[in-house]
Amino acid sequence: MNFKGTLPTLILEALVREPSHGYLIAQRIKQRSQGVLDFKEGTLYPALHKLENDGLVESYEGMEKGRPRRYYRITESGRGTLTKDRAEWRKLSQAVTIILGEA
């Protein structure tokens, strides 16, 4: 299955509690999906940059273990988008569950 279209929503969800750097965002998604969703850097960072260009996340420089890192945090606009995306995903998920249950 291709979950690429859901990546922006998953990134926003990963950032809703606290800012994070890209690697940690990917790890959160992987852990919460029990390893099903494992996004690589080549997929994750373009999505983060698009979210930043769209004003849904913002980034800043920080340090972790003496190394510079770029951290991302969700904006108020991003929170609004996430709320809308959650509702749309629940509706879609329910419809698919109904259809698959008929098989």
Model-predicted segments: where are they?
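Basic, amphipathic "hinge/linker" alpha-helix immediately C-terminal to the N-terminal HTH DNA-binding motif
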Residues: 67-86
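Basic amphipathic alpha-helical segments that dock to polyanions
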Residues: 44-51
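N-terminal helix-turn-helix DNA-binding core of bacterial DNA-binding proteins
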Residues: 2-43
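Beta-hairpin "wing" of winged helix-turn-helix
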Residues: 52-68, 73
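Amphipathic alpha-helical dimerization/coiled-coil segments
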Residues: 82-103
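Generic recognition of well-ordered alpha-helical segments
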Residues: 27, 31, 76, 91-94
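Absolute protein N-terminus
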Residues: 1-2, 103
